[in-house]
């Protein structure tokens, strides 16, 4: 197993020249010969019939050569070569083993719980069970970063194929968002939809030279479909609190209400979710990791806990916050702006909960985070003076209505009251309230 650390990579290998079972940690550049011999033997043993040869690249730089056999959701992988001078450019959090690369490839495709996934893939002649089939068509290109995967012998360049600069299929965007549309020849497919995470209907659209994410809401019940409103109003609250968050608007596309936001990554700046780096230990492990970083990262994490407590964000998970990364050097650049606040501001309150203020407030009071136990104890334990100033501004705030699309005036009023109450609760007492999480 290889371990990414600041300043280099470590791997666990047999002690050189020692026939015993003893193992030790050594810097990778001291074990290149051992690693190459290990890989050659493995390649001879495992590179059997039915495997195709691929290259994982960053821009046009080769990182890893490997053979792959499409055996379903997780492909059979055999790494055949690792560029010794590019170890620091390996995707953050990816274990450079056959299984580690297979897992990375699995997550380089549209998730199984995505709305309309089967319709989307069927229209392109693909299957959710064929990871390498999807990779063959999409080249693993993403709007999160500048990694991609090509068949050995493919002469195309990153400039010719990347999704940031090149046109992508409007037809596939339509299918991804609505589930309807004509079949598409995979030989001409270029779309970010193959590598976009999340379960709600969504698609990327290029407008006036910029790229925007359109995301619909839940459907099927009287308390669904409010996510676009929550995104729009949560951003207003972030502005009052001084929190760095992505601006959302409300729009309609294909007759469906959706949120709309501009992309915050580029060819040069990638997004890496914290879950790619901190893989176990839960939120406490995340806090501990942030504690090893510059103060701007700790400030952002504190801002997130306070903001989530105010808006009752019940879907903050390890995939929707993290880091902006310099794509050229693969090093942390800044904390990523906060995004994905559709499951906040009591979006699942039903018509029954809207009948009276008291019923709505009771519903608001029982909301809980997904990765820790209590909004208020955690937020209070990391609050600073900058947060109190913003919270005081929320005590009498009013939501600004959208020019065209809005929740009912009654629901908006109740949201304002609930947010004001939550701000007041956070301002009460000292900041050392008991919390299940410990900070710096």
Whereabouts are the PLM-identified features?
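Phosphate/dinucleotide-binding and metal-coordinating scaffold of catalytic cores
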Residues: 2, 8-9, 24-31, 35-306, ...
């Amino acid at each position: 197993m290889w371990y990414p650390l600041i300043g280099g990579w470590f791997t666990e290998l047999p002690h050189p020249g020692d026939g015993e079972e003893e193992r030790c940690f050594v810097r990778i550049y001291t074990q290149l010969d051992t690693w190459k011999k290990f890989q050659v033997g493995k390649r001879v043993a495992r590179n059997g019939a039915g495997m195709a040869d691929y290259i994982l690249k960053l821009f046009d730089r080769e990182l890893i050569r490997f053979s792959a056999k499409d055996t379903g959701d997780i492909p059979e992988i055999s790494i055949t070569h690792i560029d010794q001078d590019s170890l620091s450019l390996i995707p953050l959090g990816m274990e450079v083993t056959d299984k580690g690369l297979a897992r990375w490839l699995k997550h380089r495709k549209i998730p199984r719980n995505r709305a309309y996934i089967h319709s989307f893939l069927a229209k392109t002649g693909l299957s959710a069970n064929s990871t390498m089939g999807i990779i063959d068509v999409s080249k693993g290109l993403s709007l999160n970063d500048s990694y991609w995967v090509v068949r050995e012998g493919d002469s195309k360049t990153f400039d010719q194929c990347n999704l940031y600069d090149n046109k992508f299929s409007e037809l596939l965007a339509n299918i991804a968002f609505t589930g309807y549309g004509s079949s598409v020849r995979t030989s001409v497919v270029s779309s970010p939809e193959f590598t976009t995470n999340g379960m709600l209907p969504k698609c990327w659209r290029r407008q006036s030279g910029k790229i925007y994410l359109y995301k619909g809401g839940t459907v099927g019940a009287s308390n669904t479909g409010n996510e676009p409103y929550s995104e729009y109003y949560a951003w207003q609250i972030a502005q009052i609190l001084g929190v760095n968050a992505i601006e959302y608007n409300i729009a309609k596309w294909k007759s469906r209400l959706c949120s709309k936001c501009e992309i915050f990554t580029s060819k040069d700046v990638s997004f890496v979710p914290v879950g790619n780096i901190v893989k176990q230990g839960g939120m406490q492990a995340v806090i501990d990791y942030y504690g090893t970083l510059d103060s701007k990262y700790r400030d952002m994490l504190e801002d997130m806990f306070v903001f989530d407590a105010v808006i009752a964000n019940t879907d903050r998970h390890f995939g929707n916050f993290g880091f902006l990364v310099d794509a050229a050097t693969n090093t942390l650049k800044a904390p990523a702006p906060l995004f994905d606040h559709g499951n906040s501001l009591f979006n699942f309150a039903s018509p029954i909960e809207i009948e009276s203020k008291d019923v709505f407030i009771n519903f608001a009071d029982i909301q809980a985070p997904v990765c820790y136990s209590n909004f208020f104890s955690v937020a209070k334990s990391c609050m600073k003076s900058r947060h109190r100033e913003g919270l005081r501004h929320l005590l009498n705030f009013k939501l600004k209505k959208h020019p065209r699309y809005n929740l009912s005036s009654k629901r908006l009023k109740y949201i304002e009251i609930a947010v004001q109450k939550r701000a007041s609760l956070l301002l009460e007492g000292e900041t050392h309230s008991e919390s299940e999480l410990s900070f710096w």
